[in-house]
C-alpha cells in the first residue's frame, strides 16, 4: 500500500515540471515550488485538481476556463498557500480548538421567543443586524453542558473572551463587506439551538453536533475560504502587480484573482483592525 509520503515523492517531480507550463509571474511560481517541495498531500491534491482544469481547458482551447483555472491558482497561492501568518487569535483558535468549542456562545430559539424585546436582547438578532452590542451580551452564554468538562482548561475566562472577541470582530467585518467573501450578511457565528416541530428543544446529541458543525465552519471560513492577508504579504502582491503593469493580460489576471483580498493589521498590540487590500484601489 502506497504511503502518503511515497505518494508525495512520486507527485513532486510531476508537479515541479508543471510549473514550466504556467504563464504566471516568477514570485508566484517560486511560492508554488516551495510548497511542492514540502510534499504536503492536501495541498498537492488541491493543486492537482486545479492544474487538471487548466490542462484540459488548454487542450480543448477553452480560453475562458483556462483563465478561470489560472485565477484559482493565483488566488490559492497568494491568499491561502502562502499566507502562513495567521492573526494571533487564529493561532490561538488552532491551538485551543477543543477548549473554545466547549465554550462557544449559543442561544436557544425558545429563549428568543420568550423575550419581550428580542431585537435588543437576542444574540441572534444582534448578529443579524451587525450590532456591536452583541460583544457585550454573548459572554453570558459561553458555558455549555453538552461536552465533557476538561479538568484543567489552559485558558482563563478572560483569555477565551479575548479570543472570541477577535474571532467575531473578523466575522463582523466580513458580514459588513460581503463583496470580499462568501459570507452571507445574515450569517450568525454563534450556535443557534432550534426547536422541534412540536415546540420543545432538540435533544442533547443534536445540540452537540450543532456546536461541532458551527465551530468547524468558522475555522474553515477564517483560515481557508476567506482568510485575511498580512501586511507583509500585501506588499508582495503589490510588488507583483507593479512588476506586471506592462503585461496587461497577466496584470488583469492577478487583479481578478485577488479582487476579494482584505488585510489584517496587528501593529497595534491592543486592537487588530481589518481593511480592503491597498492593491484593490
UniProtKB/Swiss-Prot annotation:
Regions crossing the membrane: none
- Supply the alphabetized keyword list: Mitochondrion
What Gene Ontology biological process does one annotation of this record name? mitochondrial genome maintenance
Where does this polypeptide localize?
A: Mitochondrion
User: What are the GO cellular component annotations?
Assistant: mitochondrion
Query: Is Ion transport a UniProt keyword of this protein?
Result: no
Principal subcellular localization: mitochondrion
Q: Name one Pfam family in it.
A: GEP5
Please give the superkingdom of this protein's source. Answer: Eukaryota
* Family to which this protein belongs: Belongs to the GEP5 family.
Give the protein's function: Essential for respiratory growth and required for maintenance of mtDNA. Required for cell survival in the absence of prohibitins.
* The protein's name in its UniProt record: Genetic interactor of prohibitin 5, mitochondrial
From which organism does this entry originate?
A: Vanderwaltozyma polyspora (strain ATCC 22028 / DSM 70294 / BCRC 21397 / CBS 2163 / NBRC 10782 / NRRL Y-8283 / UCD 57-17) (Kluyveromyces polysporus)
Amino acid at each position: 500500500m502506497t504511503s502518503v509520503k511515497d505518494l508525495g515523492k512520486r507527485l513532486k517531480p510531476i508537479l515541479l515540471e508543471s510549473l514550466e507550463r504556467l504563464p504566471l509571474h516568477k514570485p508566484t511560481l517560486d511560492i508554488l515550488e516551495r510548497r511542492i517541495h514540502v510534499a504536503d498531500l492536501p495541498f498537492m491534491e488541491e493543486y492537482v485538481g486545479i492544474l487538471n482544469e487548466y490542462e484540459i481547458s488548454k487542450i480543448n482551447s477553452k480560453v475562458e476556463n483556462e483563465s478561470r483555472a489560472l485565477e484559482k491558482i493565483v488566488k490559492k497561492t497568494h491568499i491561502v498557500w502562502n499566507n502562513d501568518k495567521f492573526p494571533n487569535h487564529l493561532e490561538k483558535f488552532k491551538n485551543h480548538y477543543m477548549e473554545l468549542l466547549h465554550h462557544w456562545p449559543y442561544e436557544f430559539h425558545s429563549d428568543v421567543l420568550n423575550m419581550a424585546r428580542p431585537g435588543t436582547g437576542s444574540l441572534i438578532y444582534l448578529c443579524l443586524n451587525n450590532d456591536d452590542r452583541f460583544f457585550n451580551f454573548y459572554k453570558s452564554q459561553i458555558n455549555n453542558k453538552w461536552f465533557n468538562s476538561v479538568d484543567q482548561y489552559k485558558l482563563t475566562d478572560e483569555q477565551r473572551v479575548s479570543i472570541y472577541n477577535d474571532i467575531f470582530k473578523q466575522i463582523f467585518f466580513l458580514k459588513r463587506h460581503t463583496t470580499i467573501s462568501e459570507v452571507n450578511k445574515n450569517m450568525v457565528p454563534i450556535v443557534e439551538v432550534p426547536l422541534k416541530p412540536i415546540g420543545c428543544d432538540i435533544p442533547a446529541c443534536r445540540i452537540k453536533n450543532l456546536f461541532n458543525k458551527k465551530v468547524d465552519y468558522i475555522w474553515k471560513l477564517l483560515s481557508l475560504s476567506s482568510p485575511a492577508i498580512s501586511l507583509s504579504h500585501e506588499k508582495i502582491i503589490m510588488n507583483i502587480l507593479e512588476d506586471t503593469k506592462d503585461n496587461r493580460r497577466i496584470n488583469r489576471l492577478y487583479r481578478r484573482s485577488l479582487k476579494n483580498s482584505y488585510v489584517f493589521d496587528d501593529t497595534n498590540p491592543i486592537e487588530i483592525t481589518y481593511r480592503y487590500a491597498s492593491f484593490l484601489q
